[in-house]
């Protein structure tokens, strides 16, 4: 069985801009820099922050806001330097640790980012965003239990945050705690019905729990909002096939292929649906398409061989089976009885009748 695809929502990145709190020339430059920055002109703002720093080299707010401007421009090394200067001048500035952590994340220095978010939590233990961003690092490192704990802390501080429910649900799903994941996706959707990825991943959780009708409904919701989601068509097709809705599954696999023609999994599974429908010519074509892109896919040779049995092409079928056994000798023991059964059924029944067993059963 091919694995479903899961989408993950990246945790929100928060930045904080400090308000000016100094007087004189430095204050004027800082105020002008802040005005320009808020007007979407970070380059011009940096020049004003430079003036403020020149007037007062110990003005932490100027370094902080210049760091934010560099961050907005994607100049993350410079942002780190400015946030580090803020921390040197004011070691208890939680927001400087937080923002430097975000810059480190962009630089793919997650270990340093983790330390900074932890420092921010120590200084501001009641600020949910610190836990959210640390949780996202844990999640990215597959430390799912730690991610659960951090997202839980964030929800304790802000129980109305839909994205945090979503991200905790993803952590539950990664730990195969599907019931908890489904519950959290539901909470996320009750707070923000526009979270299309929550419908999608809840659909995955439902499908993995053999709740295929619920899964189909969630994939329906995804496709209402994003009719070009090839993954939603693909996974909805998988669920439809599980409840013997093969014609409908074929339609969804076809839409998935139309939207993502280079994906070999949709034609593979559409071929299996065609087999169940007794459309052996169509099935053989799909498995042939898979073999073109995946010439070492033993399963595709097995399935095409079964289709060819029902087409009356025994010689070609046997060649497919031998190729499959050459690629993966271990599968012969399991599939040989199915091959023998298919040959017997093909002789006893007219071509075009639905199959009995197939290798996935």
Protein language model regions, located:
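Conserved alpha-helical positions within TPR/SEL1-like repeat arrays
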Residues: 30-38, 61-72, 95-106, 129-140, ...
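Terminal, low-structured helical/coil segments at or just beyond the last alpha-helical repeat
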Residues: 3, 26-28, 310, 315-361
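Short coil loop/turn residues that delineate tetratricopeptide repeat
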Residues: 58, 92, 126, 160, ...
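N-terminal leader/linker segments that initiate helical-solenoid repeat arrays
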Residues: 19-43, 47-48, 65, 343, ...
